[in-house]
Regions:
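A short, surface-exposed helix-loop junction/capping segment
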Residues: 118-122, 330-332, 381
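Short amphipathic alpha-helical segments
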Residues: 114-118, 122-134, 141, 268, ...
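Conserved aromatic-histidine-acidic binding/catalytic patches
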Residues: 48, 58, 81, 85, ...
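Glycine- and charge-rich intrinsically disordered segments
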Residues: 1-5, 272-288, 295, 476-500
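Extended, helix-rich architectural segments
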Residues: 1-164, 168-172, 176-179, 488, ...
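Extended, regular secondary-structure scaffolds
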Residues: 135-261
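Extended, charged amphipathic alpha-helical segments
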Residues: 232-372, 376
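C-terminal helix-loop subdomains that flank or include functional centers
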Residues: 308-325, 338, 342-345, 349-500
Length: 500
């Protein structure tokens, strides 16, 4: 075998990947090293962002734990118990996540392959239940940067799929690009009883190509789970009724990434979302602080140091001053106006910046007024479309891995060998279109194949079904024409041409 000049028998990337793969195998085979990696992962910033992304989507924002503080004596911040402390959140982040997920995965997938039998088998596997799972995978990928799909056989022996929360999975990769999985650890909690007391146990499962090993996480150590011995991914019975343990050639955990860096969406927009919540809360606080709208100045009722001055101003809305001669006493007011327009302007800027940084779209965009043309619509969707292209690239690669398990399942269950069959997975984006313009363009595109035009038609959801209906309609028209021709000939002189 010959190699390119200066390349040798292996590239630097291959050597690096070999080192990474060797290191991953060493960790999995050494419980002490594995315990260290689990401890690091449980407290890592990456996992914290995964958990935080899920919490923010559910509406658990930092503003809900916000404490109102003022400058006290000595310039130190102290908690103010007597001031309004509204904690208002406007969850624009959840809206952005739903927008992106529904845009990318709101519609069912379209599968294309030249083998009709294979297509029917795939459609049976990738059914509506799978579409729901895939959409939830999209939520996981955006909130945590990566999602995990587990293909397995359930208790009824059916081939199906399960999603694992990304904060539960610690992957070990074979390569620096994180494309080939060597093994993985799953950490989760499970309730149980010690006598009459309900307790939570931390469980750990180690997934390799040799099956699954189960442990209990106790005081930072891995203890073998006596209730769950090592298991394989599949158990079958031979002709004699004897159980045979089988495993996949690959680890059955498939990553679906939001982007190549596995960065969650929240990391782009958290400061903007927090800013929106803070502005709304501060505005409500100011509206409720009647005493703060008017500051009382008490003349010649003892002076005060700066720390006491700031505390009294914030908490009581009053300050005491002493004139030089001390002859004048009384009360004077200082009016402060809360300008709501300032809050509106800042909120508008924050929301616009959140949409732009999160690469979404504004459904209230001025370009969508009246009857927008297709160019205006495409312009509004440009940012979310570019981001969707990146997500689709990652998901397409994941589907290649998923199809390997599907093909192995079909082969093992004697449904056919489709390993070399080409499959095109199409993500049907839920985009607003000017239907009239699209239909007009398709009508004028006579040079395109009929199937292509039908696939692009806005009213078509199942291309094969529409083609079947069209063929049936054409057949009925031909039958009507044949019946008409026969009747016409009979009236003219008989079917055989003789005069009647």
């Amino acid at each position: 075998m010959e190699y390119f000049p200066f390349q040798g028998s292996g590239t630097d990337t291959e050597e690096l990947n070999n080192i990474i793969a060797t290191g991953a195998q060493a960790i999995i085979n050494n419980l002490t090293l594995l315990e260290r990696e689990i401890t690091k992962f449980k407290t890592s910033q990456k996992r914290e962002w995964m958990i935080k992304g899920e919490l923010y989507y559910e509406g658990e924002h930092d503003i809900l734990t916000h404490e109102r503080k003022v400058i006290g004596v000595g310039g130190r911040l102290v908690k103010a118990e007597n001031l309004p402390n509204n904690r208002i959140l406007d969850n624009q982040y959840a809206k952005l996540v739903d927008q992106k997920v529904n845009y990318q995965l709101g519609k069912p997938l379209t599968l294309e392959t030249e083998n009709d039998t294979y297509l029917k088998l795939l459609q049976k596997i990738f059914n509506k239940r799978f579409h729901r799972t895939l959409r939830n995978m999209g939520l996981d990928a955006l909130n945590g940067g990566i999602a995990w799909l587990y293909p397995y056989y359930n208790e009824q022996g059916e081939f199906t799929f399960k999603r694992f929360p990304n904060s539960e999975i610690l992957p070990f990769w074979k390569d620096a690009e994180h494309t080939i999985l060597d093994s993985a650890v799953r950490m989760y909690t499970e309730s149980g009883y010690e006598g009459d007391k309900e307790v939570l146990y931390e469980k750990v499962e180690v997934y390799t190509s040799n099956g699954v090993k189960c442990y209990v996480w106790f005081n930072g150590r891995l203890v073998e789970d006596v209730e769950k011995p090592p298991i394989s991914y599949l158990t079958i019975e031979d002709e004699d009724g004897k159980e045979i343990q089988l495993n996949w050639q690959r680890v059955p955990l498939i990553p679906f990434k939001f982007n190549i860096k596995e960065i969650p969406l929240l990391k782009r927009v958290k400061s903007l979302q927090d800013g929106i919540n803070t502005m709304l809360s501060d505005f409500e606080n100011n509206m409720q602080e009647d005493a703060r709208s008017t500051i009382l100045i008490l003349h010649n009722y003892d002076g005060q140091n700066l720390g006491e001055f700031r505390r009294n101003l914030a908490q009581y809305g009053a300050v005491k001053v002493r004139s030089s001669d001390g002859s004048k006493g009384g009360v004077e007011s200082l009016q402060i106006e809360v300008n709501s327009d300032n809050y509106k302007a800042i909120l508008s800027l924050f929301k616009k910046a959140l949409i732009e940084n999160g690469r979404g779209y504004d459904a209230k965009d001025e370009r969508m007024a009246n009857n927008p043309n297709q160019m205006n619509i495409q312009s509004m969707y440009s940012d979310i479309d570019l981001d969707a292209n990146g997500i689709e690239t990652e998901f397409q690669a994941s589907f290649e891995e998923l199809l390997w398990f599907v093909n192995m399942h079909l082969a093992n269950t004697n449904q056919g060998d489709y390993e070399n069959e080409e499959v095109n997975v199409i993500f049907n984006r839920d985009i607003l279109i000017n239907e009239m313009e699209v239909v007009e363009v398709l009508d004028k595109s006579a040079y395109l194949p009929l199937e292509t035009r039908i696939a692009q038609h806005p009213y078509v959801s199942d291309v094969q079904l529409e083609l079947k209906r069209l063929k049936q309609e054409q057949k009925e028209q031909m039958d009507q024409y044949d019946n008409y021709e026969t009747t016409f000939k009979e009236k003219q002189g008989g079917v055989d041409g003789t005069t009647t």
